[in-house]
Curated annotation (Swiss-Prot):
Residue numbers spanned by region Disordered: 561-580
Protein name, as recorded: Leucine--tRNA ligase
Encoding gene, per UniProt annotation: leuS
Annotated Basic and acidic residues bias: 571-580
Cysteines engaged in disulfide bonds, as pairs: none
Domain of life from the UniProt record: Bacteria
Motif ('HIGH' region): 71-82
Pfam families xref list: Anticodon_1 (PF08264), tRNA-synt_1_2 (PF13603), tRNA-synt_1g (PF09334)
Species per Swiss-Prot/TrEMBL record: Streptomyces coelicolor (strain ATCC BAA-471 / A3(2) / M145)
Residue positions binding ATP: 737
Amino acid sequence: MSETNPAATAPVSADAAPHRYTAAMAAEIEARWQDFWDAEGTYAAPNPKGDLAGDPELVAKPKKFIMDMFPYPSGAGLHVGHPLGYIATDVFARFQRMTGHNVLHTLGFDAFGLPAEQYAVQTGTHPRVSTEANMKNMQSQLRRLGLGHDRRRSFATIDPEYYKWTQWIFLQIFNSWYDDEAKKARPIAELVAQFASGEREVPGHAGRAWSSLSEAERADVLGEYRLAYASDAPVNWCPGLGTVLANEEVTADGRSERGNFPVFKSKLRQWNMRITAYADRLLDDLDQLDWPEAIKLQQRNWIGRSEGARVDFPVDGERITVFTTRPDTLFGATYMVLAPEHPLVEKFTPAVWPEGTRDAWTGGHATPTEAVAAYRAQAASKSDVERQAEAKDKTGVFIGAYATNPVNGEQVPVFVADYVLMGYGTGAIMAVPAHDSRDFEFARAFELPVRCVVEPTDGRGTDTSTWDEAFASYDAKIVNSSGTDVSLDGLGVVEAKERVTEWLERAGAGAGTVNFRLRDWLFSRQRYWGEPFPIVYDEDGIAHPLPDSMLPLELPEVEDYSPRTFDPDDADTKPETPLSRNEDWVHVTLDLGDGRGPRKYRRETNTMPNWAGSCWYELRYLDPHNGERLVDPEIEQYWMGPREGLPHGGVDLYVGGAEHAVLHLLYARFWSKVLFDLGHVSSAEPFHKLFNQGMIQAYVYRDSRGIAVPAAEVEERDGAYYYQGEKVSRLLGKMGKSLKNAVTPDEICAEYGADTLRLYEMAMGPLDVSRPWDTRAVVGQFRLLQRLWRNVVDEDTGELSVADVAESDIDAGTLRALHKAVDGVRQDLEGMRFNTAIAKVTELNNHLTKAGGPVPRSVAERLVLLVAPLAPHVAEELWRKLGHESSVVHEDFPVADPAYVVDETVTCVVQIKGKVKARLEVAPSISEDDLEKAALADEKVVAALGGAGIRKVIVRAPKLVNIVPA
């Protein structure tokens, strides 16, 4: 049986107890409670005003706005990998409701996109028809999972009522410019006023008054300032797709990310967003966001602003050039690191290790050549994101060469390490471990010098041997930075940078430089199924915005939905859009309300990219039925405004895939900042906390032709896999219909129930880690629910089986198990560690099962409340059986008694050179001195040391002692 074979079903024997928790019972319970929630509006989150206003007491509570990256309504529907993030946010939202929050959690659809257009091309069916059918199917699938969404707030980006405001936002951006002095967007009318008054000189028209310029000349001038502008510029033209592509949609080898067609540079007139104007703010404000470091890193690298200095480090008559943003710390550079791909690695790697090379630097290899080759092979298997992400263990090897620090003449060792990339800067860094966290960790791992050159302001002193982390503040004075030709001691960071950069330039050892990578966002697509631009052109080709009264500009009917595609290798072709074929729609006579009366115009026939609708959808969730304005300011302030810990405001939690790091997430941040500058919103950032869930993977089986075969029909024999008698290969990868390995949530819900599916997906592992699907393992969570049910309900009678026992009469072991579970589950749910929360619930449930006899009612009630966020249907049913009329959704989450939570002892691991040699049971409050004495006196430790001296003992009471022998 394959891992994706759903044949392993919930066990039901013929003589099963009549009131046992079964798949049939789960189906009945789940359907009934889902109907109840809908009828009662259980998940309705009240606004402070407007048509969705509600209970003032609930509005007065702390609020949480929890969002998923909304789905595209695919015709294939959902497989079990899709709901992973949706279930996780639902668990978290339920927990937040139970801890006293007004929780907004809903879900819409990102419904413009290429698949529906391709289906329309193939079948002639309008994209809206197929898309709405797909949405209906997915809504049914999602409802069956018991997701607690406020359905009043749902919408699709294809709704004219929605994309009216997408078009409106485009016009706000079109009618704005970025004031570099004010560091914000301003209405274009204010720029026109400056030109008209003479306050600002008209660029390109020296000496001419604004009033003397023709309309076309004025339009050209303003086009150089507008935040949305059309220009004739080199674009990425893909003849095979018949459309132009943004930089982000082109692979490193110059092909389309979708379809793998050749992409050529071609000069075309296209719409662009001047996102580069916001590069500094987009970069700087990342520091205020609670996002994964890997995502921040991708955005930082994509934006690519780097201001600092180029520094040359001599090596054997050659030089290694680095780019550093902290030239003021040059005296603190104690080693260098090259990216594994750096072209100088081979050149500088000698045949033998230099005399005195430490064993820890060699990676266990006999020669530098072997060490570097092995390390490069290891690094080649990692993505850039994996290489740069924060990690506890830093890896690398010494290449066997030393470079000269130009400011003090010191010889510093040169390493190769995967946390340095070739695609950024020069592919080489000067490492200043005292003032960079990654360099600090690397230096500690390889026992490299850590020299303080920026005086700490936190009282830790300059003796780095006592430091636990780097000191990276800019608000400090430079120390230990005096050489023969230049001294920085006593200077502030900014002044020190200027002085050392001047010295580098005088000495011919470097120069001040700026690095910047971000480009303006190409915003035109030659597609049908997208938002039309609210722009028309007059007979002179000048662009004019439609007035608000003409929004939404809806998509017209066309006979052919596809753009014209060409020979993929024909670079001399030009786009032909579907909208351009509807002559009656393209050529119109309109009165734009500008005092000129009716005039002939030509509509823009490109459409907006599929990213447009997702750039602002968090705002529509707040006030989804408002037809008069983008969002009511009071409602936006309530849910998304700046507050303590969130200086830029934004959604409290946003969960979705890491693949959107430099597309959707960057674009949405840009739009938010423009809307903030123009006073339409109070939140300058859309999403304060971002969490990237992992992927549920599945095995893909392929025959000798490389074609995927149905996973459910593959048989395993003697460690090999066969399909219809033919041996097939197996590889872990994505799950999907085309790979013939998809398992649908409908199948699992039918076999076990939605609560079991929810528990299994949450229990598979940490939420941010990818994990393989195994249908055979689902039954484990089903059995947990059966045991839970059995601890509360008599399977023979269906009556409660709990005991009404006073808290004081419950045995201490049960109380300790209960309160430790309550404490642990609360912490785990808050930290989104759902797999360990389920493990703690299981541990408590098992304790109660083994204890025998009826479970005390107060213990059973708290157990049900612990389960409620994870398995809400069975929790509701048990809560009702326990005599409660209210829904468990808004009950208070249990609170642990600290007296029962403290462990009497904890396990301390004793390591020698990083290897575990002993485990000690010690008091949680043991001092570091006493712990060190106990570790050194342990028989196993004494034997392992074998009489060797001790160079250092690292103690982290009460759980770790690390001994470094002499």
